[in-house]
A protein has these predicted regions:
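Conserved beta-strand signature within the Rossmann-like core of class I S-adenosyl-L-methionine
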Residues: 131-141
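Short beta-strand-loop-alpha-helix junction that forms the active-site gateway
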Residues: 107-120, 142-144, 148
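Interdomain/boundary linker segments immediately adjacent to catalytic/signaling cores
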Residues: 1-82
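Arginine/glycine-rich "motif VI" loop of SF2 helicases in the C-terminal RecA-like domain
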Residues: 126-132, 166-170
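Active-site metal-binding core of divalent-cation-utilizing nuclease and nuclease-like domains
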Residues: 53-58, 62-101, 112-121, 128
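Domain-level recognition of nuclease-like catalytic cores that cleave nucleotide substrates
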Residues: 141-202
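Glycine-rich, phosphate-binding/catalytic loops in enzymes
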Residues: 122-124, 154
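Structural motif
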Residues: 102-104, 134
């Protein structure tokens, strides 16, 4: 799988130049770029079928699980509950890595564009509250999203709001939006079904 674009929404203080960040960056890149389909192919090829209708396109959550399993193998904690923006039971972050008394989190978008906004808002607020040292939201390009089953949030839809988040006054932290994309499209590969185990993608 390819990383197409990385947008730094928050880039403040010493953390973005630290050894801790370089380790986290390597982990994230490895987790994304190691995702394969079909298994053992050495690349990520989506079935040539737009996901406009029910039952069509490739599943989103199995692709996410493949990334998360790699992060877990690299020492990350999965499904970490963090009370940032709610007084009720907080929803878990997909993956977190502890840096001293703060966390760096990774979210892989499987919902719609509203979900993408919530994820960025939650991570930005976590940085402002000094609960998080940073975060990264991973989501598809528009080119990739058209082959996925759900109307998942995508990079171009979120981009008009980048100036809003970039205007935040933060003294320490790093917040990234990472756009990913398939290596190829083919009608010779299987469709990734919604119920496919993430391990099958590695």
């Amino acid at each position: 799988m390819k990383i197409i674009q990385i947008e730094r929404i928050i880039d403040a203080g010493n953390f973005p130049q630290s050894h801790d960040w370089r380790k986290i960056e390597r982990d994230i890149f490895q987790a994304i770029q190691s995702i394969e389909w079909p298994p053992g192919s050495g690349s990520f090829t989506l079935f040539d079928e737009p996901g406009k209708r029910r039952g069509q396109g490739s599943g989103v959550k199995p692709i996410k699980r493949a990334c998360m399993q790699t992060l877990e193998a690299l020492g990350w904690q999965l499904e970490t509950s963090i009370g940032i923006a709610t007084d009720r039971r907080p929803g878990p972050m997909d993956a977190t890595y502890k840096i001293k008394d703060r966390l760096f989190c990774v979210e892989w978008e499987t919902g719609n564009i509203s979900s993408s906004h919530r994820s960025v808002n939650k991570m930005a607020l976590g940085i402002l509250k000094k609960i998080l040292i940073g975060g990264a939201l991973i989501l598809p390009t528009r080119k990739m999203y058209r082959y996925l089953t759900d109307r998942v949030g995508n990079f171009p839809e979120l981009a008009p709001y980048f100036p809003l988040w970039k205007s935040l006054d933060v003294d320490e932290g790093l917040l990234l939006i990472i756009a990913i994309e398939h290596d190829a499209i083919s009608d010779k590969v299987p469709r990734i079904k919604k119920g496919t185990d993430g391990r099958a993608l590695q």
